[in-house]
């Protein structure tokens, strides 16, 4: 029998690529922690009706892309295609609104859509997202945009642009929907097949069609920005002013509607041209009606999601993330030394040191070569001779200095050892890489 392989549209994420994932997650968590966002973890599968009601049955996600099945209890189940609906379900079910005030939440994890696999787009993919529930204030819209920008800049992305639009409220969209259908109907035969199908069901989705002729037709279509009511226009004006106050540039993009039906008012995408073409790395907007649609109280909300696969591809083109490296590399050889080396490694790890234990049982020379390549600051050498005398050899890998220490003294002076390791790390910074987070402060742009 042949070897079992991963299912099409899924992939294994292996070292050293996992360093990029850990880097992104560490930087995002650091920035979101400072803004007092709290992590939420929701189930990977939910009732199918959650997404049918929340995302919209007329969307491509619900109509074509969901992984749905009936379980052994004859219940319709769907692997989550996005994160917001599950967060909102948890917000309602767990009565989070009872705490009062605004809930600031973030999440990360796998999502599932049946799409044609390609670079940066898999059937199992990962998102990082934030949600602010309980605030209709335009400052919430701009806060999440600023956080998304800060995360991307902290990761080293510089060629970023913000596409911004408003899709208004329900009344605004109904008026615009009628105007758009009236404009597009005479061109129906020239539209691509998907857009012809959407003309009556979901005409706003035609605006982001990738078909060339459809794009040409849409260029002269009515703009939703000309159909905003007074309240919607006021909200959008305030969002734009707040972005300007923070020094965050944006481009008005009236054709930006996003792919999910729950959006209201602000819609946005943060795009990068670092790969030579515009690629959306973060997208979101306001969804003031979703909580009520799913059975909760009327609750304004706004959020975004980042596609991590696409983001990782960008980062791999640009920089090498910091990789974990040991403080100490522990070498051992001998019938008595090897078991004691494991005990010593665990004791040192329990004192907060990063210790790599060589498990090869090969000759000392080969183990020394691996120690040199490991990025460790120093090497501990333990043989049967050292066991007999209660000692250990400490070899500094940068300057090759070597000393003999009593094992008892080594364990009794961990603070001194850490200080010496820190001194060598500072003197020879090439030996180790540590996570560091630099965050663009939008307030720097204020006079």
UniProtKB/Swiss-Prot annotation:
EC number: 6.1.1.21
Stored InterPro entries: aa-tRNA-synth_II, aa-tRNA-synth_II/BPL/LPL, Anticodon-bd, Anticodon-bd_dom_sf, His-tRNA-ligase, HisRS-like_core, HisRS/HisZ, HisRS_anticodon
Uppermost EC category: ligase
Molecular function GO terms recorded: ATP binding; histidine-tRNA ligase activity
Localization terms from the record: Cytoplasm
Annotated SUPFAM superfamilies: Class II aaRS ABD-related (SSF52954), Class II aaRS and biotin synthetases (SSF55681)
Gene Ontology CC terms, in alphabetical order: cytoplasm
PROSITE patterns, alphabetized: AA_TRNA_LIGASE_II
UniProtKB keywords: Aminoacyl-tRNA synthetase, ATP-binding, Cytoplasm, Ligase, Nucleotide-binding, Protein biosynthesis
Catalysed reactions listed for this entry: tRNA(His) + L-histidine + ATP = L-histidyl-tRNA(His) + AMP + diphosphate + H(+)
GO BP terms, alphabetized: histidyl-tRNA aminoacylation
UniProt KW Aminoacyl-tRNA synthetase keyword: yes
Keyword Protein biosynthesis: yes
Subunit text: Homodimer.
PANTHER family: HISTIDINE--TRNA LIGASE, MITOCHONDRIAL-RELATED (PTHR43707:SF1), HISTIDYL-TRNA SYNTHETASE (PTHR43707)
Recorded family membership: Belongs to the class-II aminoacyl-tRNA synthetase family.
UniProt protein name: Histidine--tRNA ligase
Source organism of the structure: Synechocystis sp. (strain ATCC 27184 / PCC 6803 / Kazusa)
Gene that this polypeptide is encoded by: hisS
């Amino acid at each position: 029998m042949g070897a079992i392989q991963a299912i099409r549209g899924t992939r294994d994420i292996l070292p050293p690529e996992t360093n990029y994932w850990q880097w992104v997650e560490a930087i995002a968590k650091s920035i979101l922690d400072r803004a007092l966002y709290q992590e939420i973890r929701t189930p990977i599968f939910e009732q199918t009706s959650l997404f049918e009601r929340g995302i919209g049955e007329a969307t491509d996600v619900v109509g074509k892309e969901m992984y749905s099945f009936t379980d052994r209890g004859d219940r319709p189940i769907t692997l989550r295609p996005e994160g917001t609906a599950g967060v909102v379900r948890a917000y309602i079910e767990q009565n989070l609104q009872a705490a009062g005030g605004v809930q600031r939440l973030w999440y990360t994890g796998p999502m599932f859509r049946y799409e044609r696999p390609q670079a940066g787009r898999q059937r199992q993919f990962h998102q990082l997202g934030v949600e602010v529930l309980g605030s209709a204030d335009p400052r919430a819209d701009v806060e999440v945009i600023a956080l998304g920008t800060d995360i991307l800049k902290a990761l080293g992305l510089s060629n970023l642009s913000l596409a911004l639009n408003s899709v208004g409220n329900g009344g605004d969209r109904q008026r615009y929907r009628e105007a758009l259908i009236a404009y597009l109907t005479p061109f129906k035969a020239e539209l691509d097949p998907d857009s012809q199908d959407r003309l009556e069901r979901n005409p706003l989705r035609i605006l982001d069609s990738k078909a060339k002729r459809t794009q040409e037709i849409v260029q002269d279509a009515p703009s939703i920005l000309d159909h905003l009511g007074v309240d919607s226009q006021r909200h959008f004006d305030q969002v734009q002013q707040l972005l300007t106050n923070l020094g965050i540039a944006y481009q008005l993009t009236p054709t930006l509607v996003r792919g999910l039906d729950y959006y209201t008012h602000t819609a946005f995408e943060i795009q990068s041209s670092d790969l030579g073409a515009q690629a959306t790395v973060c997208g979101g907007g306001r969804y003031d009606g979703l909580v009520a649609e799913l059975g909760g109280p009327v609750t304004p909300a706004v959020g975004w999601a980042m596609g991590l696969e696409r983001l990782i591809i960008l980062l791999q083109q640009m920089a090498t993330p910091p990789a974990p490296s040991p403080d100490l590399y522990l070498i051992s050889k001998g019938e008595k030394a090897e078991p004691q080396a494991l005990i010593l490694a665990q004791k040192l790890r329990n004192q907060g040191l990063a210790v790599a234990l060589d498990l090869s049982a090969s000759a000392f020379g080969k183990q020394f070569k691996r120690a040199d390549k490991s990025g460790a600051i120093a090497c501990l050498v333990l043989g049967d001779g050292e066991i007999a005398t209660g000692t250990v050899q400490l070899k500094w890998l940068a300057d090759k200095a070597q000393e003999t220490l009593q094992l008892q003294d080594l364990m009794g002076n961990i603070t001194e050892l850490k200080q010496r390791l820190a001194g060598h790390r500072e003197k020879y910074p090439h030996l180790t890489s540590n996570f560091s987070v630099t965050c663009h402060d939008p307030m720097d742009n204020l006079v």
